[in-house]
C-alpha cells in the first residue's frame, strides 16, 4: 500500500494501535533518527483546519517572509523540496503521519495534495504557499493517516477514498497489544529498494484464478449499477500483480490473498448506501467472498450486513 499509494489510512476504534503501527513502520524503515536526519514527522491534526497552510506555513505578502505554522513540518517540506532533483532511488522515503486525520475535513486541508496523488506523473508535483512560493513534492514522499469515527470526527469523502488505501484495525485483546518499543533500524531503507520490491514490474502477472474472481466481483458491481472508479481498478490490478509475486498462497485461505487484501482495503471502503440494491450487492459479494477463500473481505461484509439489519438497511464500510 505505502509504496504503490501516496496515502494509506489506518481506521479503527481508539486504542486499536493505529498510531503505534505507523511508528513501528517508520522505525522498521530506519526513519526515526535524531533531527535533522529524521525522515518521519508526526502531525496532530486539529479541528478547524481548512488548508495545508494551517500545518505547514505560508508566504506573508505584508512582511514578504514565510510564516511557519509548524517548524518541524515546514523544515521537512523545505528539505524535500531541495531533494526533488536528486536520485530518488538512493534517498530514503519521507513519511508524514496525519494523526487523528478526520478531526477536520481531509479533503479541505489536504486538498493541495489530492491532486498530487497520481504517482505516475512525478513532474510538476508541488503545493502553493502564496505569492510565487511553493514546495516541490519528491517521488519518495508518502503520507500515513489515522482516523476514528465518532461524533467529533468528519466522514471520509468519496474523493479521498478514491485515492487512499484503507486498513481497518480490529480491537485487540490485552495480551495482543502492540509493543511500540522496538529499535529503529540501523540503516534507512532506500526508496529505490522499496520500489524494486513492491512496485509493479513488467513481468508481473496476475494469477488466472485471481483475475477470474476479480472479473466476477466487478460484474457484481456493474449488475447493481455501482461503478468502481478507474483509479481504483488500476490500484487493485497493480496490487494483485505484485501480491502474486510476493505473497505465499499455498492454502485455500490464502489462494486469493492479494485480491482479498486489495478488495478490503480499496473497494469495500467505498460502499455507502441503503436500499434493496445495496442489500443485493452485499449478498452477492458474500457468495463470492467466503470465509474459506477470502476471509478478510468476508468478515467486513458480514459486519456490514449485520449492522445494516439494525440500522434501517444502511450499508457502510465504516459503520460500527
Q: How would you describe each model-predicted region?
A:
Residues 1-320:
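C-terminal regulatory/interaction module of P-loop NTP-utilizing enzymes
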Amino acid at each position: 500500500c505505502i509504496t504503490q499509494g501516496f496515502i494509506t489510512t489506518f481506521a479503527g476504534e481508539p486504542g486499536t494501535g493505529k498510531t503505534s503501527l505507523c511508528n513501528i513502520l517508520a522505525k522498521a524503515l530506519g526513519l526515526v533518527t535524531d533531527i535533522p536526519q529524521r525522515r518521519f514527522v508526526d502531525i496532530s491534526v486539529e479541528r478547524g483546519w481548512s488548508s495545508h497552510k494551517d500545518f505547514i506555513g505560508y508566504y506573508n505578502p505584508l512582511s514578504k517572509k514565510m510564516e511557519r505554522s509548524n517548524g518541524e513540518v515546514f523544515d521537512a517540506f523545505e528539505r524535500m523540496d531541495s531533494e526533488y532533483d536528486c536520485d530518488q532511488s538512493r534517498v530514503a522515503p519521507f513519511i508524514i503521519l496525519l494523526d487523528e486525520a478526520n478531526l477536520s475535513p481531509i479533503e479541505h486541508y489536504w486538498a493541495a495534495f489530492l491532486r498530487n496523488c497520481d504517482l505516475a506523473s512525478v513532474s510538476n508535483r508541488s503545493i502553493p504557499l502564496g505569492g510565487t512560493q511553493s514546495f516541490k513534492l519528491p517521488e519518495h514522499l508518502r503520507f500515513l493517516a489515522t482516523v476514528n469515527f465518532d461524533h467529533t470526527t468528519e466522514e471520509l469523502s468519496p474523493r479521498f477514498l478514491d485515492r487512499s488505501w484503507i486498513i481497518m484495525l480490529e480491537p485487540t485483546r490485552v495480551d495482543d497489544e502492540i509493543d511500540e518499543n522496538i529499535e529503529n533500524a540501523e540503516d534507512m531503507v532506500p526508496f529505490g529498494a522499496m520500489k524494486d520490491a513492491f512496485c509493479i514490474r513488467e513481468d508481473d502477472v496476475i494469477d488466472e484464478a485471481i483475475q477470474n474472481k476479480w472479473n466476477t466481483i466487478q460484474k457484481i458491481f456493474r449488475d447493481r449499477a455501482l461503478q468502481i472508479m478507474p483509479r481504483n481498478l488500476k490500484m487493485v490490478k497493480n496490487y494483485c500483480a505484485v501480491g502474486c509475486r510476493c505473497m505465499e498462497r499455498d492454502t485455500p485461505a490464502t489462494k486469493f490473498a492479494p485480491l482479498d487484501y486489495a478488495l478490503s482495503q480499496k473497494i469495500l471502503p467505498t460502499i455507502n448506501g441503503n436500499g434493496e440494491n445495496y442489500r443485493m450487492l452485499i449478498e452477492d459479494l458474500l457468495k463470492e467472498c467466503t470465509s474459506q477463500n477470502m476471509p478478510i473481505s468476508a468478515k467486513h461484509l458480514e459486519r456490514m450486513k449485520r449492522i445494516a439489519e439494525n440500522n434501517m438497511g444502511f450499508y457502510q464500510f465504516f459503520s460500527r
